[in-house]
């Protein structure tokens, strides 16, 4: 019977180790994505700040691939605001995903601790 419990604990530890490694990779990926989105948001904000200093009737060129499109200041301003809003929403989603992953690993660790305590109590 002790061998079956030890085998069960060994299996649980291996699963936990795999889950921890997988979660760490996912958390690192989420951190990288959050950093990238923060840079995108900051870039859009700085660009918007610069174009707001120009006269309202100013037309500007927007780079699209290999070409440039003539746009009004208002259109570009709205695009930059939308870009910031989308980046903010994605950052919020990634933060939630990251906290969920960390919570799930903690729960798995707690479950193994409970198994060890039950094993010691026997």
UniProtKB/Swiss-Prot annotation:
One of its GO terms (biological process) is telencephalon development. The keyword Chaperone applies. One of its GO terms (cellular component) is centrosome. Keywords: Acetylation, Chaperone. It comes from the Eukaryota. GO terms for molecular function: unfolded protein binding. It holds the Pfam family Prefoldin_2. Gene3D superfamilies: 1.10.287.370. The modification N-acetylalanine is found at residue 2. Belongs to the prefoldin subunit beta family. PANTHER family: PREFOLDIN SUBUNIT 1, PREFOLDIN SUBUNIT 1-RELATED. Binds specifically to cytosolic chaperonin (c-CPN) and transfers target proteins to it. Binds to nascent polypeptide chain and promotes folding in an environment in which there are many competing pathways for nonnative proteins. Heterohexamer of two PFD-alpha type and four PFD-beta type subunits. This is Prefoldin subunit 1. The gene is Pfdn1.
């Amino acid at each position: 019977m002790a061998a079956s419990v030890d085998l069960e604990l060994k299996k649980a530890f291996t699963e936990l180790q795999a889950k921890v490694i997988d979660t760490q990779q996912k958390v690192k990926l989420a951190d990288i994505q959050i950093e990238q989105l923060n840079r995108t948001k900051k870039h859009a904000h700085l660009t918007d700040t610069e174009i707001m200093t120009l006269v309202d009737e100013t037309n500007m060129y927007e780079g699209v691939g290999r070409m440039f499109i003539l746009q009004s200041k208002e259109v570009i301003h709205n695009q930059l605001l939308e870009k910031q809003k989308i980046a903010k929403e994605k950052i919020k989603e990634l933060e939630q995903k990251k906290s969920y992953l960390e919570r799930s690993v903690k729960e798995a660790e707690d479950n193994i601790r409970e198994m060890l305590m039950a094993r010691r109590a026997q």
